[in-house]
Design a protein with these regions (language model features):
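Substrate-binding pocket helix/loop in short-chain dehydrogenase/reductase
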Residues: 14-16, 20-25
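Alpha-helical segment proximal to the catalytic Tyr-Lys
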Residues: 44, 88-89
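Active-site helix of classical SDR
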Residues: 39, 75
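SDR active-site lid
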Residues: 90-154
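Active-site loop immediately N-terminal to the catalytic Tyr-X3-Lys motif
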Residues: 17, 66-70
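Conserved NAD(P)H cofactor-binding loop of Rossmann-fold oxidoreductase domains
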Residues: 7-11
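Residue(s) in the substrate-gating loop at a strand-loop-helix junction
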Residues: 59
């Protein structure tokens, strides 16, 4: 028996001071607490199984935070820490896997009112096909991989997050600014510029 937690939302890219209390709460509740309480609910049943497993689908944002994703990154980093602790607490009793995919061609950008046009093209260029992502994740689960990182962008974020934790984020911010797409507009412009 295996529990796969795959709930997640990506709030609109914007600076932290522009988030409402409701947006903050929603991101934490869906991206983190839903997994915590799902595990809490099903763990007693899973531990009675002959081959139990828990897999939390996280994000490359858990490996390195990007400007404009403060609440998403925080909730995904919390999920990473939770999953890593679970793995040690239940080592030998239950397989616990963490999956950190990069951009995937799904409708996660549905909530991004400004994701169309040039922004959508840029995201699609670095995104992994959904069917391919599923195959890679399923392979990892079948082989009980503790950590899965999939997608060119996810691997880049993993490397930069480890080797250049400060300057890596700066580099990604510079790329986001240079892309000059509406998707990231609220991240780098001040309130006066946004009003114009």
């Amino acid at each position: 028996d295996i529990l796969v937690n795959n709930a997640g939302i990506l709030p609109k890219f914007k600076r932290f001071d522009r988030y409402s209390d409701e947006e903050i709460e929603r991101a934490i509740n869906i991206n983190f607490y839903s997994c915590v309480y799902s595990v809490k609910t099903f763990l007693p049943m899973l531990l009675k199984s002959t081959d139990p497993g828990i897999v939390n689908i996280d994000s490359s944002a858990a490996l390195m935070s990007l400007a404009g994703t403060s609440m998403y990154s925080a909730s995904k980093a919390a999920l990473k820490g939770f999953t890593e602790a679970l793995r040690e607490e239940f080592r030998g009793k239950c397989y616990v896997g963490l999956v950190c995919p990069g951009f995937t061609k799904t409708d996660i950008f549905r909530g991004q009112s400004n994701a169309g046009g040039k922004g959508e093209k840029v995201i699609n260029m670095i995104s992994t096909d959904c069917d391919l992502m599923v195959k890679m994740i399923m392979f990892g689960i079948e082989h009980k991989q503790a950590l899965q990182i999939h997608g060119v962008d996810a691997h880049a974020m993993s490397v930069f997050g480890k080797l250049l934790p400060v300057n890596g984020s700066r580099l990604f911010s510079a790329v986001m600014k240079a892309a000059d797409i509406d998707l990231f507009k609220e991240v780098f412009k001040d309130d006066v510029e946004l009003a114009e």
